[in-house]
Amino acid sequence: MTPGEVRRLYFIIRTFLSYGLDELIPRMRLTLPLRLWRYSLFWMPNRHKDKLLGERLRLALQELGPVWIKFGQMLSTRRDLFPPQIADQLALLQDKVAPFDGRLAKAQIEEAMGGLPVDAWFDDFDIQPLASASIAQVHTARLKSNGKEVVIKVIRPDILPVIQADLKLIYRLARWVPRLLPDGRRLRPTEVVREYEKTLIDELNLLRESANAIQLRRNFENSPMLYIPEVYSDYCSQNMMVMERIYGIPVSDVAALEKNGTNMKLLAERGVKVFFTQVFRDSFFHADMHPGNIFVSHEHPENPQYIGIDCGIVGSLNKEDKRYLAENFIAFFNRDYRKVAELHVDSGWVPPDTNVEDFEFAIRTVCEPIFEKPLAEISFGHVLLNLFNTARRFNMEVQPQLVLLQKTLLYVEGVGRQLYPQLDLWKTAKPFLESWIKDQVGIPALTRALKEKAPFWVEKMPEIPELVYDSLRQGKYLQHSVDKIARELQVNHVRQSQSRYLLGIGATLLLSGSFLLVNRPEWGLMPGWLMVGGVVVWLVGWRKTR
């Protein structure tokens, strides 16, 4: 470790101890050397004894800075790793930091635009940022070419070395978790950090975010439900993104929405429909739909439209995952726990040798109490969470795409019920899911699949006789090759057997000659001839092994 890394690690450990986070480590895991090390090098009392553990963890991460704040935000979505009181506190982490100097942002923009001054491309560039976060900040301007208002997102200068340095330390600490926590190995801390690293590095590439926004905008083009601002890709680079400036009401400002005359019931239901449309129709969903990234258009409050920004994190599901997920939801709400268990096994989410009866009983035990509530009060997100937590006891592998989906669903539910507390997600989603499943199976789906594949098979039809002939000929050659290899293996086996036999005889003659030479000198040349014969036989055997 470099001196800088040692200093940073020392600061991190002292921060954790000042918030009493060593409480997370069972006393029995702290050996005497570790205790001596802790009190000699890191003597630091808990200065926040009046606060609960979850709050202390949140405050410690906030003190450690942006990389740790985002790590805590990511951990808040992994409710399979933490008890609810800790996960809820981590969800409160705010990714708000002081803005960096606007002149540095201006210099980065000029560098991205080939060294030309900002005035060559933009009018009314505001040196004061509109918003600032740990990874990037946003400035406003107008395009010189058409006068349209835009926002310019710029990555913080020199943020990559800071991220890489802290990630190295997070990896080091993650490797200690299995040694210090009883359940540490099951938590797979290194995999969790690797998942976080991928998400964070992806956020540093604004070309990726630009592509995501363009895709989402195309998916919802002319939709009354969701609007994604236009991206001006000619101006975008890895460190800079330019997109249309939008004006809307923050979705969390319920009072302003009501004052504008917004149809709150329709708005809440559209949030659910937008989510399921992204997941099941498009297989491409905005995975960071927290209230700070969602606005509502001022126009047509009786027919409200969402506006989505910050498309840095997206998720996708393949066709099989979508089908299993939809069938899981329907089976769960029909209380068909056997079907839920079988779907988990069929999908490969749990090992194929899982005892389905035991799995069904575990799901029933955990999930049946949920139905004591009215359907309108049941949380889809918590349904998924309960299923994942139960499945993890049966060695369910972490499914990153499903973790993202569950996090997004919790956001959608939270926003929907904040807007309209009586929102019945099941009533809104069930027709969509049943319609989608019906569209994927049966005669219409088979007919559609055949139509899609027909041009391919028509194109390949003339080649089929030749392909069959080539396959038969290759099969014949393959059989010859197999026979040849089998003969060679048999010859080698015989040769190896002969070699071992000769090596054994040679070694026996050599040892016998040596014994007689020492103990029976009166035998004359006989021991010598035995030794020479042994060497010759041994060499012949050795050559057969070559």
Curated annotation (Swiss-Prot):
Protein kinase domain residues are 124-502
- Active site location: D288 (proton acceptor)
- Answer whether the UniProt record assigns the keyword Membrane to this protein: yes
Instruction: Report the transmembrane regions from the record.
Output: 501-521, 522-542
Record-listed ATP binding positions:
L130, A131, S132, A133, S134, I135, A136, Q137, V138, K153
What is the enzyme's class at the highest EC level? transferase
Membrane topology type, per the record?
Answer: Multi-pass membrane protein
This entry's Enzyme Commission designation comes to 2.7.-.-
Looking up Pfam families in the UniProt record yields: ABC1
The similarity comment for this entry is: Belongs to the ABC1 family. UbiB subfamily.
Functional summary from the UniProt entry: Is probably a protein kinase regulator of UbiI activity which is involved in aerobic coenzyme Q (ubiquinone) biosynthesis.
Q: What is this protein called in UniProt?
A: Probable protein kinase UbiB
